[in-house]
Regions:
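Extracytosolic ligand-binding ectodomains
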Residues: 1-300
Length: 300
């Protein structure tokens, strides 16, 4: 829709922060308005365009797929320097994970690190050949889908049963967080790492309290989704409103300026620059590796 009607409302120019817009074409007019009146514009949704690189008042939460892939690869290389990577081809013609696995393999080659490739349809004997007996193995599938994950875990369970002492961890995808209800035990068994920009913890006391309050306010539970959109909005609001109240004009959205611990969606902004190296706005760079530990614990 047209944002001009919103911008003409009394008091809008006096805001400290505006959350939105929903659509890419709304970013420029809203951004120009916010720059004119020195208002922070928070863009929480998936948009296209590079306005954030040219407007110092824009805070872009969304990280595009390339940025997320690069963050996941960086985290992988830092966390697993001594592991043997095993890529499993899951024969999923609909998968969009090829960009990630190709880029990761390329980085491993540049670092002169060995890795193996196997196929989900291989015999147990052929499947086993891809794994190291002397190093811990880190397994990467080339799909985020649940059916292929089920088959892979079944094959890995067979491997562990037949080869005592073999060490296997899984490196997954954000989609796997949707499967935790029935995969949690397997994630812990295989020391699983899931890269993500959010983590919904259903047993966190503060999360439970917010969900109860939400149901009381709106007469229905939060929408079942990963992430919980209501909690995303809550975290964003807490981050900016408390940050601005505490730091005033000095609030830039750095991780160190986080006043209240987020329930689900942490934020950490870094300054962007235009192609001509002129200062731009702020891009969220927060990224986590959720680790399902062998002892049943969780860490990030």
């Amino acid at each position: 829709g047209d944002v001009k009607a919103l911008l003409s409302q009394p008091g809008t120019a006096d805001c400290d922060v505006i959350f939105g817009p929903l659509y890419t074409h709304q970013v420029k007019p809203l951004g120009d308005f916010c720059k004119q009146h020195d208002i922070r514009l928070v863009v929480p949704f998936s948009i296209n365009g590079s306005d954030v690189c040219y407007n110092t008042n824009i805070y872009q939460v969304y990280q595009n797929p390339d940025e997320q892939n690069n963050a996941a690869i960086k985290a992988f290389l830092e966390r697993f320097p001594n592991h043997h990577p095993v890529f499993i081809d899951c024969n999923d013609s609909t998968s969009k994970k090829g960009a990630f696995t190709f880029a990761l393999r390329n980085q491993l080659q540049l670092a002169k690190r060995d890795y193996s490739i196997t196929n989900l349809n291989n015999s147990e004997q052929m499947f086993l050949k891809a794994f190291s007996r002397t190093k811990p193995n880190i397994v990467i599938l080339n799909t985020g889908r649940s059916p292929e994950l089920n088959v892979a875990i079944a094959k890995l369970n067979g491997l562990v049963a037949n080869v005592p002492g073999i060490s296997i961890s899984l490196f997954g995808y954000t989609e796997w967080l949707m499967y935790t209800k029935y995969q949690s035990a397997n994630f812990h068994k295989f020391n699983t790492y899931i890269p993500t920009t959010f983590y919904y913890n259903a047993v966190n006391a503060n999360t439970i309290n917010l969900e109860r309050s939400y149901s009381r306010w709106f007469g229905e539970p939060m929408q079942y989704a990963q992430p919980r959109f209501a909690i995303t909005g809550y975290d964003h609001c807490q981050f900016f409103v408390r940050g601005i109240r505490h730091f005033g004009k000095n609030f830039c959205g750095y991780r160190s300026q986080q006043v209240k611990f987020p329930l689900q969606t942490p934020l950490s902004f870094e300054r962007t620059f235009s192609p001509s190296k002129k200062e731009g706005g702020w891009q969220n760079k927060c990224y986590m590796l959720i680790h399902y530990m062998l002892d049943g614990g969780l860490e990030s």
